[in-house]
Swiss-Prot record:
Membrane topology: Single-pass membrane protein
Family: Belongs to the cytochrome c oxidase VIIa family.
Protein's GO biological process: mitochondrial electron transport, cytochrome c to oxygen; mitochondrial respirasome assembly; regulation of oxidative phosphorylation
Annotated function: Assembly factor that mediates the formation of some mitochondrial respiratory supercomplexes (respirasomes), thereby promoting oxidative phosphorylation and energy metabolism. Acts as a molecular adapter that associates with both mitochondrial respiratory complexes III (CIII) and IV (CIV), promoting their association. Mediates the formation of various mitochondrial respiratory supercomplexes, such as MCIII(2)IV(2), composed of two CIII and two CIV, and the CS-respirasome (MCI(1)III(2)IV(2)), composed of one CI, two CIII and two CIV.
One Pfam family here: COX7a
Origin superkingdom: Eukaryota
Stretches that traverse the bilayer: 86-108
Organism: Danio rerio
Compartments, as annotated in UniProt: Mitochondrion inner membrane
Protein name: Cytochrome c oxidase subunit 7A2-like, mitochondrial
Keyword Ribosomal protein in record: no
Record pathway: Energy metabolism; oxidative phosphorylation
Amino acid sequence: MYYKFSGFTQRLTGAASSTAYSPQGLRANVPSESPAMIFGTPTKLVSESSATVEYMGKNRVPDLQRIFQASDNIPVHLKRGVPDRLLYRSTMALTVGGVLYCLVALYLAAQPKKK
């Protein structure tokens, strides 16, 4: 009896001698020609379309460039006002809280157990 590893069941299964001696994945009768292309039709490029795309919305890049490139001595992470300040402060509060929590957890883990 000959055995071969089954990739489907992940176990050894019975096999014929010819399949047991041939390595898996390497077959002698592999076709030499490549398969047909799945996407053989040419795709239409965006530049070829005549109508404007409606789902993109307004281009906000020039407005954001104007805001972020202004030299008003405000840090870049606070340039957009109140939402940026709120996000910055909440991020810093969570970071400080997480560091304190880790330090307390390390302190409690370092204490010997009471018997």
